[in-house]
Structures are given as C-alpha cells and as structure tokens.
Amino acid sequence: MPSTFHVSTPLAASPGVMFEFHSDPHNIVHVMPPSLKVLELRTDGPAQEGRLIEFECRDWGFIPMRWKCRWARVEPPEVLVDEMIEGPFATFVHEHRFESLPAGECIMHDTVTFAFGRSWWGWLISEIGVRAYLHLLFAYRHARTRKWAREHRA
C-alpha cells in the first residue's frame, strides 16, 4: 500500500522559471544535501513525457543507489511528474506542481507517492523510516530551491 508525502514552499520566482529549473535533471545536484552524492546522471535532455533519467548516487557516503525514472507527465509551466521504474522502491512517483502567485512568484508543491515494499513490513518501513527521511530531504531541497529562486528570479 503506497504512502503519500506532501510539502509546499513559496518561491520568489515564476512558475515558468521554476518549471524550467526542475525540468532539467542535471539541476538535481543543486538541491541535494551533501550526504547524498549524485555520481552519474544520464538523460537525453530536459523533461519530455516518456524520456528516461538514470542516475547513480551514494547516500551517507556508503549506501549505493541506482535509479531509472521516466517523465510521466509534463505540462509547462505547472506540472512535472517523474516515476521510478527501477530502483530502491516498489513505488516512487514525484509530482512538482507550481502554483502562480502575484508579483511573478509561485508556490511549489511536491507530492511523493512511495512504497518501500508491498508487504505490511514494507508499509511500516515506509511510514516510519522513509517518511522521516523524506521530511529531512525535502526540508533541505526546499531551502536550496528557495535560495536558487531568489538568485534567479524572473
């Protein structure tokens, strides 16, 4: 049974600027915490429905992870959805939604649907361990994204 995690943050940049930033997979290195190193990233370009993203990373310096994701939904400048098709989770779908605000700003909504496994043990691990990890990860990512938005406001 998948779980859902949601977090939102106001950004001092337009939905278009933030959509463009998040549609380029190479920008992931700008928002990842120092404990999560992206070692290799492969893609054929920016977000396009069906396009693949593959990356290898190390979490905490010693936990290797390989992810293969696909852009499932791309609706400029409001919605980007990527889904893991191979990797450490049974289910992992990440939606970015950019809600327009006055004065050229926006609110970024991140919703992650995830399951570590398909059994009740997997659900328990997801609810206790993964959810806590996502809180830490996205707090860092949103702080870095707010900083980036202030510096690249348009």
Question: What residue ranges belong to the model's regions?
Answer:
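Hydrophobic pocket/interface hotspot
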Residues: V17-H22, I28, I53-F55, W71, ...
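A non-catalytic, amphipathic alpha-helix used as a structural packing/dimerization or gating element
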Residues: L136-R144
